[in-house]
């Protein structure tokens, strides 16, 4: 086979979302923000918004429509959408009764959707954030503060809370919808298995053809499967060889879901008297012929080994991993989650494509020719300040930092291929290119400190997804706020190194409100915190701060990950990097490169900010 994906001239995510709207008359598309909305949603009900990285279709946009989601926000492949996109989705469908945001438990999603929720609350909009974490493959000891991953159970949550908000003339309150969603999440378990990793469009068509020895060591062998593999190619519980029969594999998976003696993975009780929902989810590359055979095996073993007879059985592609050749099993204890009300919501009619429905002839005839609409304004683009930077200094420093970061992108990508999902280098490069383009077009209002930082935040939010985009956007936005707050107190001023040091500390404290990561947790914070602290301690000496930043980044080679997808990776996969001192955190290395570029340019100029 020459390739596993077609070649596309246009952005694949945009093309997919537009195609989805062509095929579904009820949908509209905010093209600039990759937001799909149900054009029939009314403000007299709780709005349901969800989203995340692309590559899991039909999640999330495929669940937008009557009786399910009102808004779906799409990031790039395997990368969270930006806060700006999510805010656009919130503003596109405001509700008198508030909005429930449903998000899978991944760091980037929590950061971006959490920040969007906080912004909405600050404007007086009632918002609740419901986090789905149904994976049982990562045990209690290993998941620590990170929690369980969000998997196929997310699609059941979408259907249930969407119906709860839509059904009946006396519409449910935000609190009622959220409480039902919480009960469902608390009684939901999922585990998957796969024959191989998925392949990502635009990358080489299969990792096995790589000559890179490090990549080869992480591949599944020809007669091997991975139990518990995540939906972004994350490592699972174990690898099994030779490939077992489906009967043996299903028995193993059901034990992880239902064994009450397993202290690591026993998250939900299931008794023979409980009413249970079963979902068999296609990870994207399993044939329907096999999928229904697998489902039959699961149903039979539930009955014979556990005396459980599912009251509802759903089989299909609900939460995929691109072309992943695997499947997952999800069980929902309806008795404990809410009983009849849960079934009423599951059975509530909907036409969303993710729930295998269809439209009538009359609805097709009424389909509008155009579904593209303008995005609502998200921020005040005209906001200005009297906080002053030196134009020539800031431009030189930014250019140098971004260019230095771009030289490190291949190495960062290599590190993140092992420690994450491989997108960190590209994500940082996207941000660097966006800032360089802004400078080249002479559109950055550099002399206005607050305005220029706000502009940088906007382009970073647009260009960067994932965890890195969230961290950088929050930090830069908080830095701008700190400088603005000082102006409100004392009037206009020139930014000195000492003032910048104080505002950097304010920005770091603001960032800490949105992540539990601290120095020592093997994240970007290990480079950022020392930089900020040393910049303040040295009264604005960028060279000393740069040294501290580098030392912090290098220290991550010896640290154990506690956050993000790196926390799921086995120690065995880090061994190929022992010769260079260990595998560092990719985000920390990226920040160190950026700061190094800043320091190089600043040393040459030797002037004020």
From Swiss-Prot:
Enumerate the residues binding substrate: 53-56, 104, 109
Single GO cellular component term: cytosol
Active site, UniProt feature? 232
Top class in the EC scheme? transferase
Sorted UniProt keywords = ATP-binding, Glycerol metabolism, Kinase, Nucleotide-binding, Transferase
Occurrences of domain DhaK (ranges): 8-355
Top-level division of the source organism's lineage: Eukaryota
Family matches, as SMART domains: Dak2
In terms of InterPro entries, this protein maps to: DhaK_ATP (IPR012734), DhaK_dom (IPR004006), DhaL_dom (IPR004007), DhaL_dom_sf (IPR036117), Dihydroxyacetone_Kinase (IPR050861)
Q: In which pathway is this protein known to take part?
A: Polyol metabolism; glycerol fermentation; glycerone phosphate from glycerol (oxidative route): step 2/2
Q: Which residues bind ATP?
A: 421-424, 467-468, 523-524, 585-587
Query: Would I find rRNA-binding among this entry's keywords?
Result: no
Q: What is catalyzed by this enzyme?
A: dihydroxyacetone + ATP = dihydroxyacetone phosphate + ADP + H(+); D-glyceraldehyde + ATP = D-glyceraldehyde 3-phosphate + ADP + H(+)
Note whether Nucleotide-binding occurs among the keywords: yes
What molecular function terms (GO) are annotated for this protein?
ATP binding; glycerone kinase activity; triokinase activity
Q: Which PANTHER family match?
A: TRIOKINASE/FMN CYCLASE (PTHR28629), TRIOKINASE_FMN CYCLASE (PTHR28629:SF4)
> Which protein family is it in?
Belongs to the dihydroxyacetone kinase (DAK) family.
What does the function comment of this entry state? Answer: Catalyzes both the phosphorylation of dihydroxyacetone and of glyceraldehyde.
Protein name in the entry: Dihydroxyacetone kinase
Name its species: Pichia angusta (Yeast)
Q: Which gene encodes it?
A: DAK
């Amino acid at each position: 086979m020459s390739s596993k994906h077609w070649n596309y001239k246009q952005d694949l995510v945009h093309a997919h979302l537009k195609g989805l709207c062509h095929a579904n008359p009820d949908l509209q598309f905010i093209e600039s923000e990759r937001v799909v909305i149900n054009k029939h949603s009314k403000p007299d009900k709780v709005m349901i918004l969800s989203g995340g990285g692309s590559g899991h279709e039909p999640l999330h946009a495929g669940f937008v429509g009557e009786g399910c989601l009102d808004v779906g926000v799409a990031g790039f492949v395997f990368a969270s959408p930006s806060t700006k996109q999510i805010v656009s989705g919130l503003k596109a469908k405001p509700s008198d009764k508030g909005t429930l945001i449903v998000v899978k438990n991944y760091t980037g999603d929590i950061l971006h959707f959490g920040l969007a929720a906080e912004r909405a609350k600050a404007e007086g909009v009632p918002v609740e954030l419901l986090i789905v974490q149904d994976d049982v493959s990562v045990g209690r000891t290993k998941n620590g503060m990170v929690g369980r991953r969000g998997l196929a159970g997310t699609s059941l949550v979408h259907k249930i809370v969407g119906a709860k908000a839509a059904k009946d003339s006396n519409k449910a309150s935000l609190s009622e919808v959220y409480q039902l969603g919480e009960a469902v999440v608390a009684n939901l378990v999922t585990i998957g298995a796969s024959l191989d990793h998925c392949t990502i469009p635009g990358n080489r068509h299969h990792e096995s053809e790589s000559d890179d020895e490090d990549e080869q060591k992480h591949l599944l062998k020809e007669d091997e499967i991975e139990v518990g593999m995540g939906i972004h190619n994350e490592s699972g519980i174990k690898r099994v060889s030779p490939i077992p029969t489906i009967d043996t594999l299903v028995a193993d998976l059901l034990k992880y879901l239902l064994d009450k003696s397993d202290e690591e993975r026993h998250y939900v009780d299931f008794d023979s008297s409980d009413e249970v929902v079963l979902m068999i989810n296609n990870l994207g590359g399993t044939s329907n012929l096999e999928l229904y055979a697998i489902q039959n095996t699961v149903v039979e073993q539930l009955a014979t080994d556990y005396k459980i007879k599912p009251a509802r059985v759903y089989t299909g592609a609900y939460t995929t991993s691109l072309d992943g050749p695997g499947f997952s099993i999800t069980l929902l204890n309806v008795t404990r989650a809410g009983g009849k009300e849960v079934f009423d919501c599951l059975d509530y009619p909907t036409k969303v494509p993710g729930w295998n429905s269809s439209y009538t002839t009359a609805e097709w005839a009424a389909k509008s020719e155009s579904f593209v609409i303008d995005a609502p304004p998200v921020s005040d683009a005209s906001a200005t300040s009297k906080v002053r930077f030196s134009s020539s200094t800031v431009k030189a420093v930014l250019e140098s930092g971004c260019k230095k970061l771009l030289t490190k992108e291949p190495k960062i990508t290599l590190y993140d291929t092992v420690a994450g999902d491989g997108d960190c280098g590209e994500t940082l490069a996207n941000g660097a290119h966006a800032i360089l383009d802004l400078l080249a077009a002479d559109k950055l209002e550099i002399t206005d400190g607050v305005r220029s930082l706000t502009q940088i935040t906007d382009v970073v939010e647009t260009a960067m997804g994932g965890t890195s985009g969230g961290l950088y956007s929050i930090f830069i936005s908080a830095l701008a706020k700190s400088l603005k707050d000082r102006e409100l107190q004392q009037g206009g001023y020139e930014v000195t190194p000492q003032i910048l040091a104080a505002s950097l500390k304010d920005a770091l404290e603001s960032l800490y409100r949105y992540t539990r990561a601290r120095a020592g947790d093997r994240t970007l914070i290990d480079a950022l915190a020392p930089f900020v602290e040393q910049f303040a301690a040295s009264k604005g000496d960028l060279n000393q701060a740069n040294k501290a930043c580098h030392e912090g980044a290098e220290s991550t080679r010896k640290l154990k990950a506690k956050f993000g997808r790196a926390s799921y990776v086995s120690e065995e996969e880090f061994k190929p990097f022992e010769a260079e001192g260990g595998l560092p955190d990719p985000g920390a290395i990226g920040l160190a490169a950026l700061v190094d570029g800043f320091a190089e340019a600043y040393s040459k100029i030797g002037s004020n900010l």
